[in-house]
Amino acid sequence: MAESFGVKMGVEGEKEFKNALKEINSAFKVLGSEMNLVTSQFDKNDKSIQSLSARNGVLTKEIEAQKNKVQTLQAALENASSSFGEADSRTRSWQIQLNNAQADLNKMESELKANEDAIDRLGQEMEEAEEQTDDFAESLSDS
């Protein structure tokens, strides 16, 4: 009897996790459309601070949603593992989804880091250009 209760709880818990993942995936569709909007507002090769900052804003939201997805998948995996056992196909399916979600999170975080580095480089280049302009203006006034 206790075993059937555990399986019942596992199945019901699995339904809840699937519903939670549907909500998260729906949020990703909205974020994907937001990224498409940002991309359409700037040339694809636009590396301006404004363009990179806009992408960072959306990437940050995507990363938060992805972290939520990873947490949900971790909980689903734990639930399936305790309810069905680690060798069960449902447990393995959750493990695969978790691995893929974690890999996607790693990619998103790398992209965000690359954008932040590009913003920093652009900021430094702007400062250097400003200093050179000031130096040039100063040399003209000295002449």
Regions found by a protein language model. Give the residues of each.
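Residues at a specific register/face of alpha-helical coiled-coils
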Residues: 1-16, 20-143
